[in-house]
Structure formats: C-alpha cells, structure tokens
C-alpha cells in the first residue's frame, strides 16, 4: 500500500530474499544461528540481516526517505547445520555502501555490533566473511608482508624461530635484556615481549626497549645474522602507543608488537600505517581472542578475526599450533593460515572456508605457532606450517636444563635438521622422531632438550570442530 503504515511487521517480509543474486561488491557473511524455540529460521536469519544493516524493531516513517532496496542487508540462503539440532547457517549479503572505506572498526560495528544480543536468537556466531576486492582495495593491509620481511631479514627457505621471554612478568629490564641476548645468541631469529608486558612498575617500557636494543645489536655483531625483538608498543592510549613505536624506530629496532583485540582495530590500523611509513615490521598478538571465538555456537570464528587483521594490518599473527597446549584443530587452522598467507583462497567447507576470498595482492601475514611446543614438535610444525611461518618456543627454549642459549641452540639445530630432511625428500610425519634423534647425536644441546620433553603431552579433545 502507498503511504506509511505504523506497527510491527515480521522481518522476513523485507529481509529474507532467497531469490537474491549476490553482487561482486557485496560483503557476504555466514552466521551460525540458533533461534529461540518457536522462531522459524527464516525469521531469525532475516532478523540478523535487518539488525546488522538498516532495520529496527518497528516500521518508521523515515524509511520512506531512503531506498531500502539499495541499502538493506539480505538473508539470501539458509541451510541446517549437519548433526546439530536447531542450528542453521544463514547467509547474509550487505551492500558495500553501508561501510566506511578502510575501517575494520566500522565493518565490525555494523555486522556484529548489535545483533548478538538479539532476543529472538538463543546464540549467534559469525563463521566467515567474504570481503569483496572493492572494499579490500580501501585498506593498506600489512605494513610489509611476507616477502618484504624475508628480504629485510635476509632469511629464506625455512620457518623463522622465536621465543617469548619468561617469566612473563617480574624481571627487571637488565635481566630481561640478558635473556633476550642469550636466546638470540643461541640461534633464534626473534624474541618476544609477552602480550601483558607493557610498562609496569618492575620494568618501564623505555628501560626495556633500551636493554633489548643493546642485546639485538650485540648479537648481530657477533653472529652476522639479522635479529629482532618484538617490542610491545601496546599502551593505554593511541598517542602513547605511537610514542613507543617512534622510540623503537629511533633505537633502530626492526619490529614492534601490538595486542590487536585488547588494543582495538582503530589503534591497530594507526600503528600499521606508522609501521609501513617508517620501515618497522609489526607483530600481532591475539590476546582475548578465545573470549570471542572459543564457543562453537556463539561469538566470532577466528578466521574472521584473522581476515580483519590482514585488512587492518600486521606482519605476524598468532594462529594456534595444532600440536601444543592451546586450541586449534588441524584442518580448520590450516584454513585460516591459508587465508592469512595466500592471495586467492577457494571455498572449502571441509576446512571451514565458506566463501572464495580474493585478496587482490594485499600482502600476506606470517602465521605464528606458539604455546606449549618443544623440539619433538619440530617435524610436525615444519610440515604443517611450511616455510612461511614463525615457530615460537617460550618454555621450549627457556626451560632447557642448561639455560637459555643452549635451549635456543637445540631449537635451531632441530629446525635445520627438519628442513634439510624435508628438502632431501624425507617424510616428516612418519620419520620425525628419527630425524630429531639423528640430529641429537651431533648436538649435546638438542640431546638434553629431547630428554627433558620426551614425555610431555597436552591431550584434550578439540572444542572447535566443524560439526
């Protein structure tokens, strides 16, 4: 009817459009929807589309002042989740004009800002996003990317090795710098500030930066290799964060670090722009991610947070290990590792990838495997992650019975042995233990490490499975 008719009407009349053909410029989202009892899936899917785009709970006369057809989100397909009762994957298409260019913050505010508290839904999870090339082209993306990083570091043909300095809190700046020196001197490429090391009473940031820089330059002079320490620039304000990054650059440090979820996407994108303009690499830690991504029926899957990070900007990001102490199922993890590194990723539901994603030459991000890993895991990690990755052993370096430098030596020897074996055509999956044992004959440090960690297992069922 012509004219405005007040009242509440069902969302599905406006926002459920199964006949809709998606456009190349649409942002597509796959939501796992669990409706309240009695709410049909079409209504639930339409409600998600409405509340995350143009809709509100009642008809408003100002709807007549705009073109809803041009701006509304549309739920265009619904399928039940196999093996789950009352769960559906609802596909929603959003017109590109709903989003500010170059703002991950605005994209998330729109798509996941309000709708997760919606009463008609028992639970809601954003499983995947297809970001169109037209939108990706408005982002700078990673400050440098994988190839530029290798060229800066002059390291090719193998994964990079890192180590988080432990104990994570409580060391003085000088002792912290000493631990950094020992690890890098033993053969690691990087050491890392823990995510919660910012600027506390026992170690202020400026002191830490100075002692770590001293360690880096001393080791570079002694080894002839380029080294780095991820200096955590995360701070309480964006201004303070940039101030720390500026100081790192003035010291000549090669890389800084940011906690992108606790720091926020706006801060992260600002830092990424600074890093590109000033030749700093940017390491990203995902502290707080499990709050958002761990429940399999509610929240946001990490593959979406990973895509968002590639748009916002970062050169490394933590991505689970598949084999250590933290969550990560193999196929799903490899799915978002590809989304981080590759330029074009085909839809593949067996790996949790709901949409084909074209990154149109946005630089790639190195996945970082970290958490409960040690020398016995090296063959599996080398095989699973390949060359373009960073393998980080915190306790697996510093827990060595002879100290930090021998711990670093053990890891470097194990890695070189695995890469050499792989290049000779050996199968790391079946021969991994043999390869490590052979290498241990030539390295007392590796032999001691093998002995310490031969019994360690973190065996729990994965929480995040596909069904």
From Swiss-Prot:
GO terms for cellular component: chloroplast. CDD domains: RuBisCO_large_I. Substrate binds at residues 114, 164, 168, 286, 318, 370. Binds 1 Mg(2+) ion per subunit. The disulfide bond which can form in the large chain dimeric partners within the hexadecamer appears to be associated with oxidative stress and protein turnover. The record marks 325 as: Transition state stabilizer. GO terms for molecular function: magnesium ion binding; monooxygenase activity; ribulose-bisphosphate carboxylase activity. Its cofactor is Mg(2+). It is an enzyme of class 4 (lyase). The modification N6-carboxylysine is found at residue 192. The active site is at residues 166, 285. It catalyses: 2 (2R)-3-phosphoglycerate + 2 H(+) = D-ribulose 1,5-bisphosphate + CO2 + H2O; D-ribulose 1,5-bisphosphate + O2 = 2-phosphoglycolate + (2R)-3-phosphoglycerate + 2 H(+). It is found in: Plastid, Chloroplast. RuBisCO catalyzes two reactions: the carboxylation of D-ribulose 1,5-bisphosphate, the primary event in carbon dioxide fixation, as well as the oxidative fragmentation of the pentose substrate in the photorespiration process. Both reactions occur simultaneously and in competition at the same active site. The basic functional RuBisCO is composed of a large chain homodimer in a 'head-to-tail' conformation. In form I RuBisCO this homodimer is arranged in a barrel-like tetramer with the small subunits forming a tetrameric 'cap' on each end of the 'barrel'. This is Ribulose bisphosphate carboxylase large chain.
């Amino acid at each position: 009817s012509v004219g405005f008719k007040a009242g509440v009407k069902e969302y599905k009349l406006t926002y459920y459009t199964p006949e809709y053909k998606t456009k190349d410029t649409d942002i597509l989202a796959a939501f796992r929807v669990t409706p309240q009892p009695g709410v049909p899936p079409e209504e639930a899917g339409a409600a998600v589309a409405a509340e995350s785009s143009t809709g509100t709970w009642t008809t408003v006369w100002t709807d007549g002042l705009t073109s809803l057809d041009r701006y509304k989100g549309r739920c265009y397909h619904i399928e039940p989740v196999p093996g789950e009762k009352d769960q559906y994957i609802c596909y929603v298409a959003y017109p590109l004009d709903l989003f500010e260019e170059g703002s991950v913050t605005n994209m998330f505010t729109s798509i996941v800002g309000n709708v997760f508290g919606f009463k008609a839904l028992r639970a809601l999870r954003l499983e995947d996003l297809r970001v169109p090339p037209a939108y990706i082209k408005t982002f700078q993306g990673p400050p440098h990317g994988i190839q530029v990083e290798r060229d800066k570091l002059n390291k090719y043909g193998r994964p990079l090795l890192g180590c988080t300095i432990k104990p994570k809190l409580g060391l003085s700046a000088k002792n912290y710098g000493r631990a950094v020196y020992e690890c890098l001197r033993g053969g690691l490429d990087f050491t890392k500030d823990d995510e919660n090391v910012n600027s506390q009473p026992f170690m202020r940031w400026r002191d830490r930066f100075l002692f770590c820089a001293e360690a880096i330059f001393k080791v570079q002079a002694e080894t002839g290799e380029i080294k780095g320490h991820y200096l955590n620039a995360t701070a309480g304000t964006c201004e303070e964060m940039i101030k720390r990054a500026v100081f790192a650059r003035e010291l000549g440090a090669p890389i800084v670090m940011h906690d992108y979820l606790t720091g926020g996407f706006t801060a992260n994108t600002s830092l990424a722009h600074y890093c590109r303009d000033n030749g700093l690499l940017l390491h990203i830690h995902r502290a707080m991610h499990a709050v958002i991504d761990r429940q399999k029926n509610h929240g946001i899957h990490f593959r979406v947070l990973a895509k968002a990070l590639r748009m916002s900007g970062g050169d490394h990001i933590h991505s689970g290990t598949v084999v250590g102490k933290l969550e990560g199922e193999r196929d799903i993890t490899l799915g978002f590792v590809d989304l981080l590194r590759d330029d074009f990723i085909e839809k593949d539901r067996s790996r949790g990838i709901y949409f084909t994603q074209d990154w149109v030459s946005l630089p790639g991000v190195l996945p970082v495997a970290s958490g409960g890993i040690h020398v016995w895991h090296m063959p599996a990690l080398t095989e699973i992650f390949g060359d373009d990755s960073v393998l980080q052993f915190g306790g697996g370096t510093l827990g060595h019975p002879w100290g930090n430098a021998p711990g670093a030596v053990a890891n470097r020897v194990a890695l070189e042995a695995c890469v050499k074996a792989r290049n000779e055509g050996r199968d790391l999956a079946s021969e991994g233990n043999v390869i490590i044992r052979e290498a241990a004959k030539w390295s007392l440090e590796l032999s001691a490490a093998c002995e310490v960690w031969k019994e360690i297992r973190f065996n729990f069922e994965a929480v995040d499975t596909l069904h």
